[in-house]
Regions:
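Membrane-interface helical sensory segment of bacterial ECF anti-sigma factor regulators
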Residues: 1-3, 17-61
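A structural signal for conserved, well-ordered secondary-structure elements
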Residues: 3, 7, 11, 48-424
Length: 424
């Protein structure tokens, strides 16, 4: 267990040092998601998303020392982090105390200090994972928002059977919708496509600011310097991510890798109304960082159908059929309406684009912190008018009781209003 935590800790720290989004999480990919007869949506993810005491069948080593970790707060959507830190302290206390009883959380200026008085080999990695997870959960109509390289939505090209649109919608080969190589792109290509989109400011956007990225040219000295600073090797023939994403240019140009100056990179700006989401990975046993050459991405119009704030009462339960731990939640009154509406629209479109010899079920996508968790389909024949949200949803996967409780806790208290990255 300690080896696993150590590996994850190294990955998180490497991401932090590169100035990248934190706490990569890995879903359990099992192909298309079945919609249960009782109309309960089962969202398959990995319990390995949350690293916590008890997430292995082997008990952790006995606690023998204290661990203190300091985190720096970065504003989200240009809000001053200082004013947002009081609720952050309360949220983190709730998150951490269920996993590490007795943990102390305090603030000093723009920093959050977490101390676990009784620590073992996995404590620091567990704290990193729980604290650096913002837990912003968003639901999208997949085909209505996913873009192909020509900038058009998948939905608008299904009747003409555009090959890339069909691959993104229905999967390709062994790749399920939302997974790597099912119409996905490398990071630079995805961000370039996203940067060419017009601003689409809307009340249903997941963020209210542009997003700034910096890339180095293939084979450039900047890529070599960034790879050296991160303890990796640059990939020949590919653009490298030097920094980002951030919501302002100043943050992007601060904390560049050693040996990289602001003039060394290409800055791409993704306007409000467009998002870049990392694909569902083929394997979740080893987290793939955003700057890994094998990482794949999709570009979507940022029209959120249901927010994480629209879910209610997330709890750790046991699947009645298998006995395995999972996380259940209901929807708020607004969430129920929106879930019915979006699944109805998806079902109607599936009926429209299908033909007697070809069924093209359509999908919704669930993203957690800009990473796709799953892209399940709606069976338009079984649910022609969508799915009633009264029965809520069930997140099932490779959970232990402890890790299922962790996810329920994180969802219960909502996303952090700031991004927290480890200091030092």
């Amino acid at each position: 267990m300690s080896d696993y935590f150590d590996r994850v800790e190294r990955q998180i720290v490497r991401n932090v040092e590169a100035g990248l989004p934190r706490a990569s999480r890995r879903p359990n990919v099992s192909g298309y998601l079945a919609i249960a007869a009782a109309a309960v949506v089962v969202i398959v993810v990995a319990g390995a998303f949350l690293l916590a005491r008890g997430s292995s069948p082997n008990p952790p080593p006995a606690a023998s020392h204290s661990v203190t970790v300091t985190f720096k707060a970065t504003a989200i959507d240009s809000k001053a982090p200082v004013g947002a830190l009081d609720p952050v302290v309360a949220i983190l206390r709730e998150r951490l105390d269920s996993v590490f009883p007795g943990v102390r959380v305090s603030r000093a200026g723009n920093e959050i200090i977490v101390t676990a008085p009784k620590a073992n080999a996995g404590t620091r990695a567990g704290i990193l994972a729980l604290v650096t997870t913002r837990a912003q959960l968003d639901f999208y109509d997949w085909e209505a928002n996913a873009l192909t390289p020509n900038g058009k939505t998948v939905a608008s090209q299904l009747e003409t059977q555009d090959p890339t649109a069909v691959a993104i919608s229905q999967g390709s080969g062994n790749g399920a919708p939302g997974g790597p190589f099912a119409g996905s792109m490398k990071l630079y290509d995805a961000v370039t496509l996203a940067s060419k989109q017009p601003p689409r400011a809307s009340a249903v956007n997941s963020r209210i600011t542009p997003q700034y990225w910096m890339f180095g040219a293939p084979g450039s000295a900047a890529c070599e310097a960034a790879a050296k600073a991160g303890g990796t090797v640059s990939t020949a023939g590919q653009h490298c991510l030097l920094n980002g994403p951030y919501d302002n240019r100043h943050a992007l140009l601060t904390g560049l890798p050693a040996g990289v100056s602001p003039s060394d990179g290409q800055i791409l700006v993704v306007p409000r109304g467009t998002v870049v989401l990392q694909a569902i990975p083929a394997s979740f046993s080893n987290p793939t960082p955003i700057d890994d050459p094998s990482a794949q991405f999709f570009v979507l119009k940022d029209n959120v159908a249901i927010y994480g704030s629209d879910i209610a009462n997330p709890e750790q339960r046991s699947d009645p059929n298998t006995g395995t731990p999972d996380v259940t939640f209901g929807f708020s009154s607004k969430g129920k309406r929106e879930f019915q509406n979006v699944t109805a629209n998806i079902a109607h479109r599936g009926d429209l684009v299908s033909s007697p010899g070809q069924t093209l079920n359509q999908h919704f996508a669930v993203a957690l912190d800009n990473r796709l968790i799953t892209v399940p389909f709606i069976d338009f024949k079984q649910y022609p008018n969508g799915i009633n949200g009264d029965n809520g949803a069930d997140i099932a996967g490779s959970f232990t009781i402890s890790s299922a409780k962790d996810l329920a806790t994180i969802l219960r208290y909502g996303p952090l209003p700031v991004t927290l990255t480890v200091k030092g």
